[in-house]
């Protein structure tokens, strides 16, 4: 298998991830495939990237905000001779702010509880905030609709097996 850099939804790179396939599913890494297949072997019915959740809706801001111009804007400005400053200038943005969305790697159900498994090889800078927002989303799901969930972030098959033990113990204690 060839090791490559691949892009994921939030435009962050997974470095040295090996794309791979199994059961007709294209996984973004070997670890995702291993975790998925392990869940199958243990008798679960995992879904790979089952759904994308909107954690914060996109919006049109009322507050004026300024950001550096894009490379295209800078190139156009320099070409037109409007301002020959070589660095990027601040420009007012009026465009819609895109929402924050999150797609968990794996979801399955166990005794009426939805279980989310986030398979991590390496973290990226966006993941931490999305993880917090998703856990808050799951809390609200329970408070408003009484839907129980559990969330696990695993970095190895060993951690997955530990997560399975926790899931089973949690179910037995009720």
Task: State where each predicted segment sits.
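Electrostatic, structured charged patches in enzyme active sites and in nucleic-acid/phosphate-binding
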Residues: 1-174
